[in-house]
Amino acid sequence: MAKERAAALRPSAAMSDIIIWQEETTEATTMVLKKGTPSFGGFREIRPQLKRASMAGILSIAELMSVGEFAYVCRKVKNYARKENKDEVYARLDEYFDLITPLDKLENEISRCILSETEVADDASAGLRNIRREIKASNERVKDHLNGVINSSAYRNMLQDFVITIRNDRYCVPVKAEYRSSFPGMIHDQSNTGSTLFMEPLSVIQLNNKIKELQAKEKEEIEKILIALSDMVTANAFAIEGNLELLTQLDFIFAKAKYAKDYNGSKPIFREDGVINIKQGRHPLLDPKKVVPINVSLGDAFSMLVITGPNTGGKTVSLKTVGLFTLMGQAGLHIPAFQGSSLGIYEEVFADIGDEQSIEQNLSTFSSHMTNIVSILSLIHI
């Protein structure tokens, strides 16, 4: 979810937005340096589950587990924000952390009842525990009886192998095909060659039926448990929705902080008079070990800057760096430059890069650029 938010990141020309976004990134960077990065692992989109639960739908075991994992992430992130001392103040981020609603009761109940994406715990309810105990005892009785059949001299020659197997959810033994009429039992399956029949002895049919009945009861009891947990999710839907939004925003903010930390970025100063003063700026997409830092000053002593020099001398990179810094800063990102660098605030950023010569209009490379520049000049506000 934070990934989608990052993909939709756009710069703002409103100073109020820029200040808030930059402060959020700065506070997150400070927290990462002091506490490490908070873990958002297990944080997944669960709105479809919430919607279905609110419509009296029953969530699956896997879906409930994902809700439980989300509640766990909420607790971890909330704990991450605990202050080690009273001097720690993160005005912007504390607003998000403080609004996270604890979901401990929901987390604990799901954790108690759900073992994995496919398994409900025996202790999820007293009824389920008793039913499974009966199933286990019935299985043992059937196996004991079938072991008696396998070891009986009366049936020894009729058996293809001395093992107990399951076919169609019924305990069976492998019987030689030629003894199908002699062995007292029901056929449930046969081998590919047809030489072996998997038969359920008549003496265990009632026991197998008992197991089937218990399994049906187990399924009903599990459904009751899932309904109760789904109702609990519905009861907490408002808090979960709010936490989803808060964690998405926090995940996004800390991603910006990690990005700033990776390229050793700094918070730029924004000047409403449009003055740019970049100190040792480094193009964010170039190898930090190879990139040549630049200093750019514009709008104070002079309002126009012409860059000249030989090919591959860094002219285009310098221009792109200024443009990217402007967009990054106004989107709330720190810039890879020394502390104290300043940027202006612009409603639009225009660029004419490369050879966009139009063959249809029969324009030269130079005139093609001039056409672009004239178009840009007609759109800018001075």
Model region roles, listed by residue range:
Residues G274-V292:
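N-terminal pre-Walker A segment at the start of P-loop NTPase domains
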